[in-house]
């Protein structure tokens, strides 16, 4: 099942990487080193440390692309070239003086694309190509709006003319594309190609004259669209964060400020070698670890407080925090949007959920409750830790702040029916070793063994175990049944022994 959740995230701001607040694009070399086009130069990140490299005659770097031999091509204001490792260090080689005819200005480089070893530089109005030995300007069929690498081919969008494909050193018009709005991504799908426009309208290659989906209201303005390795699509917007779509173009997840990412503005997205996402924001960079099997469930999805307990019961997930109980239905697929709902009446510290057969109980600082579908039924007023099943289906044992008590079900209602005498200790953890031997472990006083008869009455004096009987100390001793055997854990060891 998939629940509404937040990926683990690392945020990097200008203080971390010592550059400008805005970042524009990413790429990664064969060794996993990340490169970032930043307002103050080229950033390099090895997973631990950031480095910044200035580009001569330019402050901003808008485009970055790793080419052959791990050369890192960059484009800035009236500057193009590449960085590479030499005996002198990570050095920059400019290509601007090699451009024929030598222009006085090429303005800013907005995008860099690599196809079959050739490097294409997309300026504000023209296209340059470097083949490894020379750089030249290509004759564009018009005013250049955007460029894309699609199915290992170069595609241009020309203002008021549509899309053109670069074939055999020439540009060939793609019919039916004249009326397309500004495109930010052309991505492969299962049976066709998907065109994402800046205004949020999505087209398919087999019906370019008719919008397939209008996401203009949800998305607003789109800045970036990429296909992920699992077949999903990641969409970065100007004012509404990051969306993940499945191959059917249905929204799976939505991350925005205070809900998964650190900003509403996403300038670009990059999936790295580990299938995680680097997100360029209006202020800094987020690293979303979406490939991990772990995620966060916190205030951003409606769960307030520190987590203490979790339980899956009757197709619902119950989360217990120091602020109460939060619940959500389990889904085969995540519906968007989806958040946890606070369980009314559960305000305060939750310690545990105890399931006995087909009933779920809440162990709470305020006492013990039975959890019904949409309500709580209180039946004990002393702060409660845990319940344990007995041989009698109508009797349960409960550990609370003042000892161990029995509860009996009468006419469908649970009522206190007795208690273990001579035990006034807070009974945090209960575990049956067998039908007649119950262990209780205390947070800082050690372990207690109780021998009970069939009526849950003491047959022997309660035995106390702690440091004096072989435990490393009396602190944080717990008991568990592991593979059918009783084991104890302490603050230092796991102990497999019988006393």
Predicted features and spans:
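Carboxylate-rich, polar loop motifs that coordinate divalent cations or form catalytic acidic clusters
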Residues: 1-499
């Amino acid at each position: 099942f998939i629940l509404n959740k937040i990926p683990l995230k690392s945020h990097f701001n200008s203080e971390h990487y010592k550059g400008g607040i805005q970042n524009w694009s990413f790429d990664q070399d064969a060794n996993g080193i990340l490169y970032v086009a930043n307002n103050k130069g080229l950033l390099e990140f090895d997973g631990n440390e950031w480095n910044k490299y200035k580009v001569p005659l330019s402050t901003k770097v808008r485009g970055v692309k790793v080419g052959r031999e791990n050369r890192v091509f960059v484009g800035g204001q009236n500057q193009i070239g590449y960085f590479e490792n030499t005996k002198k260090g990570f050095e920059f080689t400019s290509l601007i003086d090699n451009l024929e005819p030598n222009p006085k200005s090429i303005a800013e480089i907005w995008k860099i694309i690599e196809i079959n070893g050739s490097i294409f530089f997309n300026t504000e109005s023209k296209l340059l190509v470097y083949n490894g030995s020379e750089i030249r300007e290509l004759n564009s069929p018009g005013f250049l709006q955007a460029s894309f690498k699609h199915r290992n081919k170069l595609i241009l969008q020309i203002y008021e003319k549509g899309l053109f494909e670069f074939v055999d050193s020439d540009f060939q018009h793609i019919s039916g594309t004249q009326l397309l709005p500004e495109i930010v991504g052309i991505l492969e799908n299962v049976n066709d190609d998907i065109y994402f426009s800046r205004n949020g309208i999505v087209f398919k290659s087999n019906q370019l004259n008719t919008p397939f989906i209008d996401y203009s209201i949800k998305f607003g303005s789109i800045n970036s669209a990429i296909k992920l390795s699992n077949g999903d699509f990641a969409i970065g917007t100007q004012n509404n964060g990051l969306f993940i779509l499945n191959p059917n173009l249905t929204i799976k997840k939505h991350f925005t400020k205070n809900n998964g990412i650190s900003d509403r503005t996403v300038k670009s997205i990059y999936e790295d070698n580990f299938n995680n996402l680097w997100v360029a924001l209006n202020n800094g960079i987020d690293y979303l670890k979406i490939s991990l099997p772990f995620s966060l469930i916190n205030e951003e999805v409606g769960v307030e407080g520190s987590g203490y307990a979790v339980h899956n019961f009757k197709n619902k997930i119950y989360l217990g925090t120091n602020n109460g109980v939060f619940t959500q239905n389990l889904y085969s697929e995540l519906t968007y949007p989806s958040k946890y709902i606070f369980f009314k009446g559960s305000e305060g510290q939750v310690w545990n959920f105890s399931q006995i057969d087909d009933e779920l109980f809440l162990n709470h600082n305020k006492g013990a409750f039975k959890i019904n579908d949409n309500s709580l039924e209180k039946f004990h007023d002393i702060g409660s830790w845990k319940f344990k099943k007995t041989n009698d289906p109508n009797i349960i044992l409960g550990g609370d702040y003042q000892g161990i008590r029995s509860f009996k079900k009468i006419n469908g209602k649970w009522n206190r029916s007795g208690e273990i005498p001579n035990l006034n200790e807070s009974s945090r953890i209960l575990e049956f070793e067998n039908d007649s031997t119950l262990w209780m472990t205390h947070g800082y006083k050690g372990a207690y063994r109780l021998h009970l008869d069939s009526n849950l009455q003491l047959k022997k004096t309660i035995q106390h175990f702690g440091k004096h009987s072989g435990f490393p100390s009396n602190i944080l001793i717990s008991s568990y049944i592991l593979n059918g055997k009783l084991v104890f854990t302490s603050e230092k060891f796991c102990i497999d022994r019988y006393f």
